Regions:
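Acidic catalytic motifs of isoprenoid enzymes
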Residues: 1-166
Length: 166
């Protein structure tokens, strides 16, 4: 997997994970980045949902056949990250951004809970992550969204919700 597939923050945090966990963390950050690209480049929500459904099929494929040759999939499988808890939540979080053009506060909460909460559960390899860890993931997801979204009002709403969660 090309390290360019991993955002800089993910590379930094993976480096701090160290050892075998570093590769696993890079794969998980690349997974989130790949889903972000789907959300960013999809103009038709149904097409985006189909692309996200493919990723869902990949992480639930116990045979290890689906997605072979795709660098992020291969990295996730090589590090055992495909079985990590929270991955479906990450997909669900990104899907909210695809299907809700006028996202409200509930939608933002669901997005943050799915994407951020799911990613930190996957990184920690803990299905029952403590509330503070899930909250940290939610705040990160909202902060990241605010920094990348073109809609100023949505970015401000995301930051306001992040402050509320803190």
């Amino acid at each position: 997997m090309d390290e360019d597939a991993v955002p800089p923050l993910g590379l930094l945090l993976a480096a701090h994970a160290g050892g075998a966990q570093a590769s696993r963390h890079r794969a998980l950050w690349a997974f989130d980045a790949r889903l972000a690209k789907i959300a960013r480049t999809t103009s038709e929500p149904m097409i985006g949902q189909m692309r996200l459904a493919w990723w869902n099929d990949v992480i639930e494929d116990s045979t290890g056949i689906k997605g072979q040759g795709e660098p992020v999939v291969d990295a996730m499988r090589a590090t055992g990250a495909c079985g990590a808890p929270g991955l479906v939540g990450v997909i669900d979080g990104w899907e909210i951004l695809l299907v809700e053009p006028d996202i409200d506060m509930k939608g933002l909460r669901d997005y943050a809970s799915g994407r951020g909460g799911g990613l930190v559960r996957a990184l920690a390899d803990a299905a029952d992550a403590p509330d503070w860890l899930a909250a940290a993931g939610q705040v990160w997801a909202l902060w990241d969204l605010a920094g990348h979204v073109g809609d100023k009002a949505l970015g401000q709403a995301a930051l306001a919700l992040a402050v509320e969660i803190l």
